[in-house]
């Protein structure tokens, strides 16, 4: 009995121990301890690859398309051009990042680079075998080669990779110079000229992935074989399955993926390994996706179908087609799922039912119907839309295109799809564009200005009157200390230049020019930025800063240095004293300055103001600004003559003075005296001007022309009409200071950036946030910016860190006193009118933006068909687009080479106080002109501006009933005056 009890006790104890041990082994406590130990082991064993984050960022920033053409007569010219362009682009990115290209399967053109040449196809036998060593200085470059190499082993080397590859977004279709189909998950690619290849496609459609590599080296492979033979590998596999950790394991490399679109179905892929670990330390499949081949095939008992889902700008699209067939169909994924659901619920299904449900032609519907009959599960791989470069253009023609093989450097990027189906364009950086810049912005305008110039003795006297009126007391000005100038120049590059040149006083006056990176509504001559030596700029700035503070800020027509709210009040004050407002537009303003304007007006003002102690130095600095030797970034020498050097300290103030003088001179030529003409100058900001309508269009344009300028009257707006100043549209400045950013100009470029340094997502947030400060209530602009921010990750940005954002948010004073806005429904009419759509169409699209929730790539776009005619002949979007002829006049009467876009069609005028429609008296009336009108009476803004603005004074003439009533009498008085010989 005792023995039985003892045995029972032993069995019970053993059972208790087993149960306790089982509970302990399966407890969360032990699992947490094992997981913590595993995490510590991972932290000890993982290796971070040096500079991976920096390399990825540099590749993103430096990815600028370089186009390389091939000889005419090539059997597949377009495909070869794209391939060569991709190779040159990748090589350029590597070298700009400071690394060396390592080219796998190089062509004869890349023979000078390190690389590897093995035999994958018959064409490879043209070259010899080679295999250079890969070092830390290399970035691997491949062009149409990744299909044939072991990407797991290659990525496992830990070296960044750039590759140009085929990434189809449909299961069959046309490609440049050929077509492709897919069978057994292999692409069959046929190109004109006889190229016929089959290969698998790697799936790069994840932003972060991993690969497992085999052991490298003789001893590592020998040890692996011994572990396999002795069963150690099997035991390790069991422990790994149960515990998630085990001894030994294969190398695992984690890497990031970025894709950049080169063409239809063609991408440049950037692969940057950033960490390594061992497969035995972590359940790697739970962490992310392993790099694998694409799987297109959908197996079933009837017929094998191929399917692939592509995330486009307008949402996911699914492509379907029978294996090996060229015919395929692509439709929205949501539509296909709805059609399939209806098919499954219906008792009888005919082809006609699928045609009706899909809304597709019979031929396409037949493919959908066949797929539904096959009852495919349709588990398709997802292909993501790659990042795009913005649209760039390059000048063509015998005068500019001196090197037919030259392909410009692209720089602008898109952080979202364009709000409109039409988008702005950017000039690429190239020699041909530099030649076009010199011709279209400097040499050409200078020649035309000289042919127009006609300076009379009276004009010289009026110029002296203007100088004396602006500077009534001579010799009082002194420059600010250079330390003050340095304090104002807070940008990093400015500070670096100040530090480098602080102890250098002598310099050679050489103008170094470059093409400005900016967007244009349509191809135009790129603007020229002419930089001057740092010492010249700093010394001259000490005078311009002092003159601005002591003189310019105190005159009523000078708008720089004022906040947006103050400028809006100035516009309203000008409207209050006028029954008509005139918008002016100068064409190529900087390039049309001549010696009279520079020396007898601009320089004369500064010299009259400065004290005699400083006159010699100022005279030398001003003389340096004329006819200085100049050279472009690519080494093209040119003569700027008397044109404005746009990088000079004189630019903003000098242009404002010249603009004001034209208005003043026109008033004097109309018969006004000095004080009267001064009071009717209006307001100016650089080359932007707005004045009262008491001088005729003809007199204004003729006056400007006699000085060499090319001035056009954009709009002569009566009371109650919209007016534009500084690219902002005022609905009715006679009753409200509210305005909106010019809709067309803004929406064409809102989604782009010229910033090549910052992260693209940060730029998108900063730019949309800036527009929500200045234009949150502007229809479409505000809606689009809110839709963008609603569908992406919020960020904290500092406006000072970004160059390519609106000027009016870079200053805290401007942000605190931003443009007045209102929520009037009439703004919808203004925006719709500029975009060439109806108000109903606009409101429908705004509702889509407000309701949108999804990826940024799918933001709704408004379809527009605005006439955006090129101002010069260019290569754009793979085509030659001809510019206007020399004698061509645009249909709306505006200057065909002007930088300002032509206004859109007019709205019908609303009735005035007399019951009749008010008429807008624009120059060259035409339906192409914007002619919108609003009510005369609107509530005024109750809150005053933050600081007073010098009001536009009321004319001193007591017999003037309206703006133009006294002009006839003034002209008579002027003729009766004794002529004075000047």
Swiss-Prot record:
Q: Which reaction does it catalyse?
A: RNA(n) + a ribonucleoside 5'-triphosphate = RNA(n+1) + diphosphate
Keywords for the protein's UniProt record, in alphabetical order: Nucleotide-binding, Nucleotidyltransferase, RNA-directed RNA polymerase, Transferase, Viral RNA replication
Basic and acidic residues compositional bias: what residue ranges? 913-934
What the entry lists under Pfam families is as follows:
Noda_Vmethyltr, RdRP_1
Which positions carry the signal peptide feature in this UniProt record? none
Q: Which InterPro entries match?
A: DNA/RNA_pol_sf, Noda_Vmethyltr_dom, RNA-dir_pol_C, RNA-dir_pol_PSvirus
Query: What biological-process GO terms show up in the record?
Result: DNA-templated transcription; viral RNA genome replication
Role, per record: RNA-dependent RNA polymerase which replicates the viral genome composed of 2 RNA segments, RNA1 and RNA2.
Q: Which family does it belong to?
A: Belongs to the nodaviridae RNA polymerase family.
> What protein does this entry describe?
RNA-directed RNA polymerase
What species does this protein belong to? Greasy grouper nervous necrosis virus (GGNNV)
């Amino acid at each position: 009995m005792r023995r039985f009890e003892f045995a029972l006790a032993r069995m019970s104890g053993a059972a208790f121990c087993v149960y306790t041990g089982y509970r302990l082994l399966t407890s969360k406590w032990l699992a947490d301890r094992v997981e913590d130990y595993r995490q510590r082991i991972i932290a000890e064993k993982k290796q971070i690859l040096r500079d991976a984050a920096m390399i990825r960022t540099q590749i993103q920033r430096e990815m600028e398309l370089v186009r390389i053409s091939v000889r005419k007569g090539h059997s597949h010219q377009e495909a070869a051009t794209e391939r060569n362009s991709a190779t040159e682009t990748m090589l350029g990115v590597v070298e700009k990042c400071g690394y060396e290209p390592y080219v796998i399967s190089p062509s004869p053109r890349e023979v000078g680079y390190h690389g590897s040449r093995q035999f994958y196809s018959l064409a490879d036998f043209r070259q010899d075998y080679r295999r250079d060593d890969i070092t830390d200085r290399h970035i691997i470059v491949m062009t149409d080669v990744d299909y044939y190499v072991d990407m797991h082993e290659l990525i496992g080397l830990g070296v960044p990779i750039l590759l140009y590859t085929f990434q189809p977004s449909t299961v069959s279709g046309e490609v440049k110079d050929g077509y492709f189909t897919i069978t057994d998950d292999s692409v069959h690619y046929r190109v004109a000229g006889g190229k016929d290849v089959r290969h698998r496609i790697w799936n790069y459609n994840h932003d972060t992935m991993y690969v497992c590599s085999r052991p490298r080296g003789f001893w590592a492979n020998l040890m692996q074989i011994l572990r396999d033979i002795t069963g150690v590998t099997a035991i390790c596999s069991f422990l790994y399955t149960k515990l998630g950790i085990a001894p030994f394991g294969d190398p695992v490399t984690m890497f990031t993926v970025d894709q950049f679109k080169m063409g239809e179905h063609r991408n440049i892929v950037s692969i940057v390994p950033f960490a390594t670990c061992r497969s035995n330390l972590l359940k790697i499949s739970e962490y992310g996706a392993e790099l694998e081949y694409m799987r297109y095939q959908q197996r079933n008992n009837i017929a094998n179908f191929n399917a692939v889902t592509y995330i486009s700008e307008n949402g996911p699209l699914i492509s379907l087609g029978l294996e090996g067939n060229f015919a395929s169909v692509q439709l929205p994924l949501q539509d296909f799922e709805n059609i399939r659901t209806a098919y499954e619920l219906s008792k009888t299904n005919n082809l006609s039912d699928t045609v009706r449900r899909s809304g597709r032609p019979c031929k396409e519907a037949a493919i959908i119907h066949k797929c539904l009959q096959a009852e495919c599960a349709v588990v398709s791989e997802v292909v993501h839309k790659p990042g795009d470069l913005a649209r760039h253009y390059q000048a063509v023609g015998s005068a500019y295109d001196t090197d037919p093989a030259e392909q410009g450097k692209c720089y602008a990027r898109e952080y979202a799809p364009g709000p409109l189906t039409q988008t702005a364009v950017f000039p690429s950086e190239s020699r041909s564009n530099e030649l076009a810049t010199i011709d279209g912005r400097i040499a050409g305008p200078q020649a035309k200005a000289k042919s127009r110039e006609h300076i009379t003795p009276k004009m010289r006297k009026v110029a002296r009157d203007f100088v004396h009126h602006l500077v009534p007391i001579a010799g009082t000005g002194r420059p600010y200390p250079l330390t003050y100038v340095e304090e104002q120049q807070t940008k990093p590059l400015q500070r670096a230049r100040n530090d480098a040149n602080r102890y250098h006083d002598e310099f050679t006056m050489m103008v170094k020019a470059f093409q400005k990176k900016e967007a244009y509504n349509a191809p135009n001559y790129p603007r020229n930025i002419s930089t001057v030596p740092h010492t010249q700029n700093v010394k001259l700035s000490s005078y311009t800063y002092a003159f601005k503070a002591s003189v310019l800020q105190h005159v009523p027509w000078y708008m720089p240095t004022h906040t947006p709210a103050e400028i809006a009040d100035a516009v309203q004050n000008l409207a209050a004293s006028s029954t008509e407002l005139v918008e002016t537009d100068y064409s190529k303003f900087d390039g049309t300055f001549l010696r009279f304007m520079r020396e007898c007006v601009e320089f004369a003002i500064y010299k009259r103001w400065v004290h005699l102690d400083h006159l010699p130095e100022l005279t030398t600095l001003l003389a340096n600004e004329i006819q200085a030797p100049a050279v472009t970034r690519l080494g093209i020498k040119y003569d700027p003559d008397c044109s404005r050097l746009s990088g000079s300290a004189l630019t903003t103030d000098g242009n404002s003075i010249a603009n004001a003088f034209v208005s003043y001179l026109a008033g004097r030529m109309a018969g006004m005296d000095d004080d009267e003409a001064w009071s009717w100058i209006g307001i100016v900001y650089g080359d932007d001007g707005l004045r009262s309508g008491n001088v005729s269009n003809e007199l204004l344009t003729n006056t400007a022309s006699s000085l060499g300028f090319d001035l056009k009257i954009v709009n002569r707006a009566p009371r109650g009409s919209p007016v534009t100043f500084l690219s902002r549209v005022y609905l009715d400045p006679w009753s409200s200071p509210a305005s909106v950013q010019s809709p067309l100009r803004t929406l064409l470029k809102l989604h782009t950036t010229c910033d090549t340094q910052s992260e693209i997502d940060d730029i998108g947030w900063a730019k949309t946030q800036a527009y929500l400060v200045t234009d949150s209530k502007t229809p479409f602009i505000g809606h689009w910016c809110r839709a963008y921010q609603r569908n992406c990750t919020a960020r904290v940005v500092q406006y000072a860190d970004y160059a390519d954002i609106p000027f009016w948010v870079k200053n805290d004073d401007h942000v605190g006193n931003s443009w007045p806005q209102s929520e009037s429904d009439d703004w919808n009419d203004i925006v719709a009118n500029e975009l060439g759509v109806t108000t109903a169409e606009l409101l429908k699209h705004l509702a889509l933006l407000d309701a949108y929730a999804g990826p940024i790539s799918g933001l709704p776009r408004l379809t527009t068909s605005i006439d955006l005619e090129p101002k010069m002949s260019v290569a754009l979007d793979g085509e030659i687009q001809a510019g206007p002829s020399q004698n061509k006049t645009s249909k709306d009467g505006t200057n065909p080479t002007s930088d300002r876009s032509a206004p859109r069609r007019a709205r019908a005028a609303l009735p005035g106080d007399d019951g009749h429609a008010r008429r807008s008296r624009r120059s060259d009336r035409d339906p192409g002109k914007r002619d919108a009108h609003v009510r005369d009476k609107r509530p005024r803004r109750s809150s005053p501006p933050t600081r007073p603005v010098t009001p536009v004074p009321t004319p001193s003439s007591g017999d003037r009933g309206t703006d133009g009533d006294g002009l006839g009498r003034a002209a008579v008085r002027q003729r009766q005056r004794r002529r004075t010989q000047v």
